[in-house]
Amino acid sequence: MANQKQMRTQILITDIPSGKFTSKWPTQLEKTLFKEQFPNLQSHLQYYTPLPFLNRIIIIFDNEDDTLQVFKFLQELLAKENSGPMKLFVTESLLNNQHPRSRSTDDAVSLQDNNLALLEDHRNKPLLSINTDPGVTGVDSSSLNKGGSSLSPDKSSLESPTMLKLSTDSKPFSYQEPLPKLSRSSSSTSNLSLNRSSQTSLPSQLENKDKSASGTKCLFASKPLGLTIDTSTRSNAASCTENDVNATASNPPKSPSITVNEFFH
């Protein structure tokens, strides 16, 4: 099993200009390889996949000998065609670390037992982390996939950048999301300071309310006032005299009254 994982059965052609895909160059290359030069290798071919959005072609065989044979031919072919920025690699296959699509019952049971053993070994190790750098997490770097080395052997990274393109005509570039700068200690201290400030502000507000309530004085208490309307001059003079004499008294005047003597139909 270990020998199979070390087999180099994948060929990568990278940095292919976009014009090559427009002119159907990958289709012509497939015809040259498997219909003209190596028709007997068609049965050993697992994948021939052009990826225009990544500017590359992936070719995967089921054995290393056929892979190296096609790889040497591609080296000579690209040198003759003056390929320019295109690069050629032979690497381990992406399919080596994946389980087959179908297994027998015995194989499934043995696979489950192996997975349980691995889980028991790593149960006590905290692997959840925002920063996946092995220097921080303490995980063995050999057990990590270095940013898709099978797809980009010359740009392997433990931080796993993302390949982005702003438009169909622009070149792809690697983008790495920055780590958050706020630490747990700083957030806890900020929450503590907020709690302290809120606790100290509440008593001061209560004291201000008590002071404002105790310092309020009533300057005038409203009382029901009344008006008197009378048609007689004697009663008006008497009421005015009485009001002048008893100005300091708190007796309210009588309620106003209107008398209707006659009704007109």
UniProtKB/Swiss-Prot annotation:
Subcellular location: Cytoplasm
Cellular component, GO annotation: cytoplasm
Endpoints of the signal sequence: none
Region (Disordered): 127-213, 242-265
Domain of life according to the entry: Eukaryota
Modification(s) after translation: Phosphorylation of Ser-152 and Ser-160 is induced 2-fold in response to mating pheromone.
Ranges annotated as biased composition (Low complexity): 141-161, 182-202
Modified residues (Phosphoserine): S104, S110, S152, S157, S160, S183, S187, S193, S201, S255
Modified residues (Phosphothreonine): T132
Record keywords, A-Z: Cytoplasm, Phosphoprotein
Note: Present with 967 molecules/cell in log phase SD medium.
Protein name (record): Regulator of calcineurin 2
Gene name of the record: RCN2
